[in-house]
């Protein structure tokens, strides 16, 4: 197959958080992007809610952070926050993991310029679509991939418009598979997965009801329910009086999704919030499986996996969607570097090496949290919890693209005491640049960065000629001078 002039640089299949983030970050770097999504629109359900500080740093690079914060800033809009294991909402507390927002974020506040946010997926996705399109990405909903052929020169794909039935062919240098946990693209390539597999089965219910007597106004939280009659979770959404309720099911005992009628779900919700007379408005009921998988390969020629297509993460800890966005950022800058001629194809191999390490940390952390809060029988058989700060901000990349030191095998560090060693995230330090106070973290994201001490001379403000290895590339370098803090009084 010879693709002399592909229709697009990158074809992204799947319009969830991972796919849309990939499209946005690629388009901002000038790549020609086409994203197709078989659903008719962005998510109509809250799904993954919450953005950790690393995700907000990436959203700052993508130019969408302010809109996400305006959509739902947990500090300003949500009031207090709690995470507890309870028999029922408002009932006996079996264990408390966070009594306040300050307790929840205290371990990360000094490590990052960005706050946590609690925007739900159905609010985030339209923002990503709008900004990706603004930068030139083409987004096609109600369009599915029916087949593709991959070769050394790229990909040829067949697409079907689900509204009209019309089929078309598109050629691309690269294909990003963001088509979810049951990824047809991954399976067609014969890419296997490893992990704990299916952990539990749930029915997810979205409903509306006035629960101010149970959850006071100005307070929000996530409750893990250990009711005598069932196990589940209860949580808020960003809309007044709208809530989520998940109840564990037992298909091995013959239970079926259709057994969970609106009437039965109403009875369970009444038990969960201890309100026998409550009449909730049931908006949606869906079956859902909790699982933990990681793909054995993240790249096959011109095809790269992103998000749930590459790994499936238990939702405990709220890191699955955040990790998908991180995948999108990492694969996008590497694809853009190759497309621009700044790097060779081997750079793409580092994507899977780096992101699979992060995914292992995230899956292990999520499993540890799941065992603590919902499945104590798993304690001792899953890794111990490292802590959100280390997993979110203290992870380390190891790959052929990182000139890493091999003197420390640990995959994380405490971001409150950053080492600055290769492979770790850039430490957060407040600096003054052109009269503006900003974080060192904000210097990264769009181009190569050189940090120079005051004795760096002519470097700050006048980027040097690229080293010889980049001589043939159109490479942009940002530089900044670092001054020591003033002496203490």
Curated annotation (Swiss-Prot):
InterPro entries: FAD-bd, FAD/NAD-bd_sf, RIFMO-like. The active site is at residue 224. Its EC number is 1.14.13.180. FAD binds at residues 17-18, 37, 121, 145, 308. Pathway: Antibiotic biosynthesis; daunorubicin biosynthesis; Antibiotic biosynthesis; carminomycin biosynthesis; Antibiotic biosynthesis; rhodomycin biosynthesis. GO terms for biological process: antibiotic biosynthetic process. Aklavinone binds at residue 317. Keywords: Antibiotic biosynthesis, FAD, Flavoprotein, NAD, NADP, Nucleotide-binding, Oxidoreductase. It catalyses: aklavinone + NADPH + O2 + H(+) = epsilon-rhodomycinone + NADP(+) + H2O. Monomer. Involved in the biosynthesis of the anthracyclines carminomycin, rhodomycin and daunorubicin (daunomycin) which are aromatic polyketide antibiotics that exhibit high cytotoxicity and are widely applied in the chemotherapy of a variety of cancers. It can also hydroxylate 11-deoxycarminomycinone and can use both NAD or NADP. NCBIfam families: AkvoneHdxseDnrF, AkvoneHdxseRdmE. This is Aklavinone 12-hydroxylase DnrF. It comes from Streptomyces peucetius.
């Amino acid at each position: 197959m010879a693709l002399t002039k592909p229709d697009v640089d990158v074809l992204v299949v799947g319009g969830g958080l991972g796919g849309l983030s990939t499209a946005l970050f690629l388009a901002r770097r000038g790549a020609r992007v086409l994203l197709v999504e078989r659903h008719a629109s962005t998510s109509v359900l809250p799904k993954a809610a919450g953005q950790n500080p690393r995700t907000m740093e990436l959203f700052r690079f993508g130019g969408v952070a302010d809109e996400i914060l305006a959509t739902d800033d947990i500090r300003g809009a949500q009031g207090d926050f709690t995470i507890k294991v309870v028999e029922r909402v408002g009932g006996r507390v079996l264990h408390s993991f966070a009594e306040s927002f300050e307790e929840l974020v205290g371990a990360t506040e000094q490590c990052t310029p960005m706050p946590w946010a609690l925007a739900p997926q159905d609010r985030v996705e339209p923002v990503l679509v709008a900004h990706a399109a603004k930068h030139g990405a083409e987004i096609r909903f109600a369009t599915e991939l029916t087949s593709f052929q991959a070769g050394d020169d790229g990909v040829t794909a067949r697409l079907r418009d689900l509204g009209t039935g019309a089929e078309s062919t598109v050629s691309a240098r690269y294909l990003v598979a963001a088509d979810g946990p049951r990824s047809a693209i991954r399976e067609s390539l014969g890419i296997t997965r490893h992990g704990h597999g299916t952990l539990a089965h749930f029915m997810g219910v979205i409903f509306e009801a006035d629960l101010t007597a149970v959850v006071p106004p100005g307070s929000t939280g996530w409750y893990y329910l250990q009711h005598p009659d069932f196990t589940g979770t209860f949580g808020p959404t960003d809309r007044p009086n709208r809530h989520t309720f998940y109840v564990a099911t037992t298909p091995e005992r013959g239970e079926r999704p259709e057994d969970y009628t609106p009437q039965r779900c109403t009875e369970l919700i009444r038990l969960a919030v201890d309100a026998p007379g409550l009449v909730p408005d049931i908006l949606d009921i869906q079956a859902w499986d909790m699982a933990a998988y990681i793909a054995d390969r993240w790249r096959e020629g011109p095809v790269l996996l992103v998000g749930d297509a590459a790994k499936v993460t238990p939702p405990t800890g709220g890191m699955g969607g955040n990790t998908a966005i991180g995948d999108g950022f990492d694969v996008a800058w590497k694809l853009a570097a190759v497309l621009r001629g700044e790097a060779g194809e081997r750079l793409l191999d580092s994507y899977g090496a780096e992101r699979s390490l992060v995914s292992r940390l995230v899956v292990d952390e999520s499993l540890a949290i799941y065992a603590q809060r919902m499945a104590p029988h798993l304690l001792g058989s899953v890794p111990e919890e490292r802590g959100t700060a280390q997993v979110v901000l203290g992870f380390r990349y190891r790959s052929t693209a990182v000139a890493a030191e091999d003197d420390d095998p640990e995959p994380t560090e405490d971001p409150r005491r950053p080492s600055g060693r290769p492979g770790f995230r850039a430490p957060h330090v407040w600096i003054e640049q052109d009269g503006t106070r900003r974080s060192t973290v904000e210097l990264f994201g769009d181009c190569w960065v050189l940090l120079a001490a005051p004795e760096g001379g002519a470097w700050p403000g006048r980027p040097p000629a690229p080293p010889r290895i980049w001589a043939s590339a159109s490479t942009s370098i940002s530089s900044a001078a670092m001054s020591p803090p003033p002496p203490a009084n």
